[in-house]
């Protein structure tokens, strides 16, 4: 061999120095690194070089140096052992595991009871049994997540966020796989849909489509929205929340750990804050965050319900004589068609808060649109405490509200024109009756529902019972 190399002047693989070969192998993926074991004895020896497997352990399994030291195994052994356990999820594991780790790290000091409610991961045989029970394959990223944590115990507050109004409370638990299987839908309108979450107060669930059916894409996550104008119970519209389980779960976690969703009284509230939605007038700053409530909204008839949370703060550096009291509010409300409504009234949510240097006042209220989006803006009128005759206005920044993407039920698309027109007329009559009976209400942050305790056994029974009951969507009056 050496004579051949001397004559030709070529280097063979066997004669290359070790360091360049190890450098080349450090760029090889784990599959090719394994295949190198079968190419030659030299490459087989080099591919067992333990530092080569360190990168793959960190990339695919997020194994840390501390975990390696605790298990007292080499990197290659750790990779192989983990692959033997969850190898089928190698394309999803890192993203899902990171989301779980980030979420728990963020919630442990803020919502410890919520973290304690998480269940241990399910076994492969448990997930296989559920697939046999429902007659459908579960998405791999869903299975991967449930190998890490099999949902949570039925507690309030739920892991998937809360929302509270004066007469309405929602808190969504992440279902364990057995309970989810019990709520698997075979009926028309929700065929092949598996519930991911459940709220014991409203009966609301987010679903994942495990098969493509009735106009849904496979693996889509959505809120169901019954068509209230259709006589066909299979007419169920959908608010799309995520294209896949990974998309749905990781985007939610990112909103939580980035501080996008505020933690209030040990609960995650699903308000979204636009950093540009802030206005400062003198020493007073007003900021707004908003949230869409699918359980109080409908596509047919068009009724989109939003709640907003307003924070009013006076700078700590303001002079004491700048202390003031809110007298009134003015709103200019514009829908997607450009229709404008103006509202003016005393105080906010029945209160006349006093703002002084360093003090923060927050409140929540809500509004509805007949279009899928709209915006609000306006101002507050204050008077100084020490100069009561002196009044001034504080700007409320324009804030936009838009419902998620929705998909209309196939049952509606298959309706005849005569049936559609008849239902439109009936809906308009009902809307007029509701408008005649409705009255303005106000709702304060003081009325946010306190932490709720629920018996897990009773909760499980109720959760299974409600799965087969269509959600009743109540109309709430607009609050300004």
Curated annotation (Swiss-Prot):
<dbReference type="GO" id="GO:1990756">
    <property type="term" value="F:ubiquitin-like ligase-substrate adaptor activity"/>
</dbReference>
<dbReference type="GO" id="GO:0019005">
    <property type="term" value="C:SCF ubiquitin ligase complex"/>
</dbReference>
<dbReference type="Pfam" id="PF12937">
    <property type="entry name" value="F-box-like"/>
</dbReference>
<dbReference type="GO" id="GO:0005737">
    <property type="term" value="C:cytoplasm"/>
</dbReference>
<dbReference type="InterPro" id="IPR036047">
    <property type="entry name" value="F-box-like_dom_sf"/>
</dbReference>
<dbReference type="InterPro" id="IPR052121">
    <property type="entry name" value="F-box_SCF_Substrate_Recog"/>
</dbReference>
<feature type="region of interest" description="Disordered">
    <location>
        <begin position="419"/>
        <end position="464"/>
    </location>
</feature>
<dbReference type="GO" id="GO:0005829">
    <property type="term" value="C:cytosol"/>
</dbReference>
<dbReference type="GO" id="GO:0031146">
    <property type="term" value="P:SCF-dependent proteasomal ubiquitin-dependent protein catabolic process"/>
</dbReference>
<protein>
    <recommendedName>
        <fullName>F-box only protein 3</fullName>
    </recommendedName>
</protein>
<dbReference type="InterPro" id="IPR018958">
    <property type="entry name" value="Knr4/Smi1-like_dom"/>
</dbReference>
<dbReference type="InterPro" id="IPR001810">
    <property type="entry name" value="F-box_dom"/>
</dbReference>
<dbReference type="InterPro" id="IPR007474">
    <property type="entry name" value="ApaG_domain"/>
</dbReference>
<dbReference type="GO" id="GO:0032496">
    <property type="term" value="P:response to lipopolysaccharide"/>
</dbReference>
<comment type="pathway">
    <text>Protein modification; protein ubiquitination.</text>
</comment>
<feature type="compositionally biased region" description="Acidic residues">
    <location>
        <begin position="419"/>
        <end position="459"/>
    </location>
</feature>
<dbReference type="GO" id="GO:0005654">
    <property type="term" value="C:nucleoplasm"/>
</dbReference>
<comment type="function">
    <text>Substrate recognition component of the SCF (SKP1-CUL1-F-box protein)-type E3 ubiquitin ligase complex, SCF(FBXO3), which mediates the ubiquitination and subsequent proteasomal degradation of target proteins. Mediates the ubiquitination of HIPK2 and probably that of EP300, leading to rapid degradation by the proteasome. In the presence of PML, HIPK2 ubiquitination still occurs, but degradation is prevented. PML, HIPK2 and FBXO3 may act synergically to activate p53/TP53-dependent transactivation.</text>
</comment>
<keyword id="KW-0539">Nucleus</keyword>
<dbReference type="GO" id="GO:0005634">
    <property type="term" value="C:nucleus"/>
</dbReference>
<dbReference type="Pfam" id="PF04379">
    <property type="entry name" value="DUF525"/>
</dbReference>
<keyword id="KW-0833">Ubl conjugation pathway</keyword>
<dbReference type="GO" id="GO:0016567">
    <property type="term" value="P:protein ubiquitination"/>
</dbReference>
<dbReference type="InterPro" id="IPR036767">
    <property type="entry name" value="ApaG_sf"/>
</dbReference>
<comment type="subunit">
    <text>Part of a SCF (SKP1-cullin-F-box) protein ligase complex SCF(FBXO3) consisting of FBXO3, SKP1, CUL1 and RBX1. Interacts with PML, interaction is direct and takes place either alone or within the SCF complex.</text>
</comment>
<dbReference type="InterPro" id="IPR037883">
    <property type="entry name" value="Knr4/Smi1-like_sf"/>
</dbReference>
<feature type="domain" description="F-box">
    <location>
        <begin position="10"/>
        <end position="56"/>
    </location>
</feature>
<dbReference type="Pfam" id="PF09346">
    <property type="entry name" value="SMI1_KNR4"/>
</dbReference>
<feature type="domain" description="ApaG">
    <location>
        <begin position="278"/>
        <end position="408"/>
    </location>
</feature>
């Amino acid at each position: 061999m050496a004579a051949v190399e001397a004559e030709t002047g070529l280097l063979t693989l066997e004669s290359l120095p070790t360091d360049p070969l190890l450098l080349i192998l450090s760029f090889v993926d784990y599959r090719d690194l394994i295949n190198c074991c079968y190419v030659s004895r030299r490459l087989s020896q080099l591919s067992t070089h333990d530092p080569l497997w360190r990168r793959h352990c960190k990339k695919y399994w997020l194994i840390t140096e501390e975990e390696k030291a605790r298990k007292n195994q080499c990197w290659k052994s750790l990779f192989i052992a983990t692959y033997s356990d969850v190898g089928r999820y190698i394309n999803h594991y890192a993203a899902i595991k990171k989301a779980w780790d980030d979420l728990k790290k963020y919630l442990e000091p803020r919502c410890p009871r919520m973290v304690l409610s998480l269940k241990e991961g399910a076994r492969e045989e448990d997930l296989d049994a559920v697939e046999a029970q429902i007659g459908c394959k579960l998405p791999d990223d869903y299975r991967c997540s449930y190998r890490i944590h099999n949902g949570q115990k039925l507690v309030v507050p739920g892991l998937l966020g809360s929302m509270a109004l004066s007469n309405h409370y929602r808190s969504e638990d992440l279902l364990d796989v057995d309970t989810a299987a019990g709520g698997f839908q075979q009926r028309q309108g929700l065929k092949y849909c598996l519930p991911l979450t459940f709220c014991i107060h409203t009966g609301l669930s987010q679903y994942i489509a495990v098969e493509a059916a009735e106009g849904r894409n496979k693996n889509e996550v959505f809120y169901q929205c019954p068509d209230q104008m259709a006589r066909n119970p299979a007419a169920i519209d959908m608010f799309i929340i995520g294209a896949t389980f990974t998309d749905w779960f990781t985007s939610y976690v990112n909103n939580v750990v980035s501080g996008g969703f505020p933690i209030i009284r040990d609960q995650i509230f699903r308000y979204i804050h636009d950093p540009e939605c802030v206005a400062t007038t003198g020493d007073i700053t007003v900021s707004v965050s908003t949230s869409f409530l699918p359980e109080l909204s409908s596509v047919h008839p068009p009724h989109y319900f939003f709640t907003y949370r307003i924070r009013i703060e006076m700078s700590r550096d303001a002079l004491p004589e700048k202390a003031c009291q809110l007298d009134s509010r003015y709103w200019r409300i514009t829908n997607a068609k450009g229709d404008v409504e103006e509202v003016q009234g005393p105080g906010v949510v029945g209160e006349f808060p006093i703002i002084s240097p360093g003090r923060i006042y927050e409140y929540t209220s809500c509004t509805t649109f007949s279009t899928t989006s709209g915006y609000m803006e306006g101002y507050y009128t204050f008077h100084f405490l020490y100069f009561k005759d002196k009044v001034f206005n504080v700007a409320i920044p324009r804030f936009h509200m838009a419902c998620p993407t929705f998909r209309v039920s196939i049952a509606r698309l298959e309706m005849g024109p005569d049936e559609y027109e008849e239902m439109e007329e009936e809906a308009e009559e009902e809307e007029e009756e509701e408008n005649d009976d409705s009255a303005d209400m106000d709702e304060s942050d003081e009325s946010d529902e306190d932490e709720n305790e629920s018996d897990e056994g009773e909760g499980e029974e109720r959760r299974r019972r409600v799965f087969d009951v269509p959600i009743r969507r109540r109309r709430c009056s607009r609050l300004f």
